[in-house]
């Protein structure tokens, strides 16, 4: 008797349960006896609820700012980026990598090396580079280090806030403030060779300061030990490699690059390009290897997926990544002068004849920074910190455990005319030399750059990391490994040297890396003579090719050209040669406007945000409220 009644009740009850999750009861039969106006209001209410329910289940897009602070060898500056971020229920928050754009670079402030050296000058005492220092005693001065870090971070924070306020509209500011701003502060070669605990302590302090910004401006900065830290030379190169290939759209999940083999396994070829990045204190060389490349057992290739530089969904690639200290433009200039002018072939009667300087150019015999005056004379900065040998001379001290306990490191210093047992001033001094004169002999310049910097008998000092990768010098890189991948060369001085030769029509505008064409052009340019005009010194080119003002940026440009020629010759001598070589500062988008400068900054963002699950979790675990 109960069954005919019970079943219909179940059916009716089931329908009523489905209403909140479906159409909200749009069956017209449920509205019998209701007038048209009431029915209209009912439908409006249902539609409103359905709209709100849809909002709960759909993805939401907003803008997020990201700050990368480049703590380089000469200065510290912010790079402020903007990106589209998407949050989806049960999927976390992700960033669209193609939306990342640089909105502005900040001002240049004090480098981290200066912060540490000023602290050591005060609390370890003057000449700490030339005597034993018990580093344990310096723990008592951590509060003072904190104050020095705070002064720098206040400047960086104010500069970042000024950029955000000037570049974002009001709606964007609301979104950026609500999400918080991840900060990635990375030091490169400037403090890479700093020994003892000082460097790591400074980064603990910097992270604390980032996570506790001023509340007045409303922006909530936050970081963690993975985002704010010293990065190795190999990492710096790999991040620059990722930047290049992302901006040039070689890096991605393009189905056209993939195929499924007979076993159903997906294989994706990579069309990646290599990069040579020359900074102030170091140079990085990174390029992909072809499948089947056989490397010596001592050489370590990096797999982008295995080392968690890229997620598994990207095409797999093995790359060579090596970084050389003392091969940056500033550091190599100091080392080159020290070695060249300690050689009897070039030092006669207190005068060092430098084949990499223009004829008629003179300076005092020092590795200090040079300023070319309007009267044509060269003023050399006597400030110890402005001496381009200072970082290397500090490293090459018998009081550095890396030197005192490792004989090979001491030999490398002595090979480069630096005696670790002498005081700092003597380690930076060029013995028996008073004047440096330019001779403008480019071929001899190339041979000296080759023997001192590119293919020295012993590895350049402070290059333990490069040696651990299997390469003791640049010439070994292309002897042991090579690639047909395109190569992009970047770095201010490297670009300036090529642009200068093009400006004087010594190189074709479409120059693509022919080494003999470059050598011939540089040979003619570097044979120029310095002439003093009424409006200042100029470089007078031979064969009536015109002239160019001499200044502090181009007086030693020929050494850069020689380094480029030497580099290209070694690339050409490898088993495989690059398909083409280009010199680029940035990569342009479809509209012809630069997307961002080449360098490691975009790459370090991608390295973190492409691992979407990890990024979404970390961005909240290390968010502003976590650090209150």
UniProtKB/Swiss-Prot annotation:
Glycosylation sites: 432
Protein's cellular compartments: Secreted; Parasitophorous vacuole
Top EC class of this enzyme: hydrolase
Catalytic activity from the UniProt record: a ribonucleoside 5'-triphosphate + H2O = a ribonucleoside 5'-diphosphate + phosphate + H(+)
Listed EC numbers: 3.6.1.15
GO cellular component, one term: membrane
Gene Ontology terms describing biological process: nucleoside diphosphate catabolic process
Keyword line: Glycoprotein, Hydrolase, Secreted, Signal
First and last residue of the signal peptide: 1-25
List of catalytic residues: 236 (proton acceptor)
CDD domains reported for this sequence: ASKHA_NBD_TgNTPase-like (cd24037)
Effect of mutating residue 91 to R: In strain: Beverley
Superkingdom to which the source organism belongs: Eukaryota
GO-annotated molecular function: nucleoside diphosphate phosphatase activity; ribonucleoside triphosphate phosphatase activity
Recorded consequence of changing residue 101 to R: In strain: Beverley
Keyword Cytoplasm: no
Family the entry assigns: Belongs to the GDA1/CD39 NTPase family.
Function: May perform an important processing step in the conversion of high energy nucleotides prior to uptake by the parasite. NTPAse-II has a specific activity 4.5-fold lower than NTPAse-I in hydrolysis of ATP. The primary difference between these isozymes lies in their ability to hydrolyze nucleoside triphosphate versus diphosphate substrates. While NTPAse-II hydrolyzes ATP to ADP and ADP to AMP at almost the same rate, NTPAse-I hydrolyzes ADP to AMP at a much slower rate (0.7% of the rate for ATP).
Assembly and oligomerization: Homotetramer.
Protein name in UniProt: Nucleoside-triphosphatase 2
Native organism taxonomy: Eukaryota, Sar, Alveolata, Apicomplexa, Conoidasida
């Amino acid at each position: 008797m109960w069954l005919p009644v019970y079943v219909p009740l179940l059916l009716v009850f089931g329908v009523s349960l489905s209403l909140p999750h479906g159409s909200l009861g749009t069956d017209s039969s449920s509205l019998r006896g209701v007038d048209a106006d009431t029915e209209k209001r009912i439908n409006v209410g249902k539609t409103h609820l359905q709209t709100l329910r849809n909002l709960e289940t759909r993805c939401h897009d907003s803008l997020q700012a990201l700050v990368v602070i480049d703590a380089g060898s000469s200065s510290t500056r912010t790079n402020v980026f903007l990106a589209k971020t998407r949050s989806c229920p049960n999927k976390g928050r992700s960033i669209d990598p193609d939306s990342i754009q640089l909105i502005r670079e900040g001002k240049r402030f004090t480098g981290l090396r200066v912060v540490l050296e000023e602290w050591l000058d005060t609390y370890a005492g003057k000449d700490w580079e030339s005597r034993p220092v018990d580093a344990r005693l310096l723990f008592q001065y951590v509060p003072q280090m904190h104050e020095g870090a705070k002064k720098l971070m206040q400047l960086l924070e104010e500069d970042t806030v000024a950029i955000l306020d000037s570049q974002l509209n009001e709606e964007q500011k609301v979104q950026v403030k609500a999400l918080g701003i991840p900060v990635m502060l990375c030091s490169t070669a400037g403090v890479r060779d700093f020994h003892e605990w000082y460097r790591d302590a400074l980064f603990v302090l910097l992270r604390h300061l980032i996570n506790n910004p001023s509340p007045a401006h409303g922006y909530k900065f936050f970081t963690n030990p993975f985002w704010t830290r010293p990065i190795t030379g190999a990492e710096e190169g790999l991040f620059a490699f990722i930047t290049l290939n992302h901006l040039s759209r070689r890096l991605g999940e393009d189905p056209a690059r993939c195929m499924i083999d007979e076993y159903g396994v997906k294989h994706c070829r990579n069309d990646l390009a290599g990069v040579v990045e020359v900074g102030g204190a170091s140079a990085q060389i990174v390029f992909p290897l072809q499948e089947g490349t056989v490397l010596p057992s001592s050489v370590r290739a990096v797999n982008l997926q295995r080392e968690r530089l890229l997620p598994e969904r990207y095409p797999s690639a093995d790359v060579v990544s090596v970084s050389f200290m003392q091969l940056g433009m500033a550091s190599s200039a100091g080392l080159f002068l020290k070695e060249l002018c300690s050689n009897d072939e070039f030092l006669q009667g207190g005068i060092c004849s430098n084949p990499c300087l223009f004829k008629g150019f003179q300076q005092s015999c020092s590795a200090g920074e040079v300023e070319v005056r309007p009267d044509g004379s060269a003023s050399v900065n006597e400030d110890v910190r402005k001496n381009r040998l200072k970082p290397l001379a500090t490293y090459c001290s018998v009081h550095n455990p890396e030197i005192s306990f490792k004989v090979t490191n001491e030999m490398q210093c002595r090979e480069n005319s630096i005696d670790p047992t002498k005081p700092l001033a003597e380690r930076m001094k060029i013995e028996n030399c008073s004047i440096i004169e330019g001779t403008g002999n480019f071929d001899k310049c190339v041979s000296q750059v080759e023997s001192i910097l590119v293919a020295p008998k012993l590895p350049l000092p402070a290059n333990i990391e490069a040696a651990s990768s299997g390469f003791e010098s640049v010439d070994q890189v292309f002897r042991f490994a090579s690639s047909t991948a395109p190569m992009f060369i970047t770095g201010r001085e490297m670009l300036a040297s090529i642009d200068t030769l093009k400006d004087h029509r010594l190189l074709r505008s479409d120059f693509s890396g022919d080494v003999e064409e470059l050598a011939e052009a540089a040979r003619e340019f570097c044979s120029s003579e310095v002439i003093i005009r009424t409006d200042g010194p100029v470089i007078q080119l031979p064969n009536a090719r015109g002239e160019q003002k001499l200044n502090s940026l181009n007086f030693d440009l020929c050494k850069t050209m020689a380094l480029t020629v030497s580099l290209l010759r070694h690339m050409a001598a490898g088993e495989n040669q690059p398909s083409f070589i280009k010199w680029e500062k940035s990569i342009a988008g479809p509209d012809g406007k630069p997307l961002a400068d080449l360098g490691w900054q975009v790459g370090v963002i991608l390295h973190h945000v492409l691992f979407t699950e990890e990024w979404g979790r970390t961005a909240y675990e290390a968010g502003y409220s976590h650090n209150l």
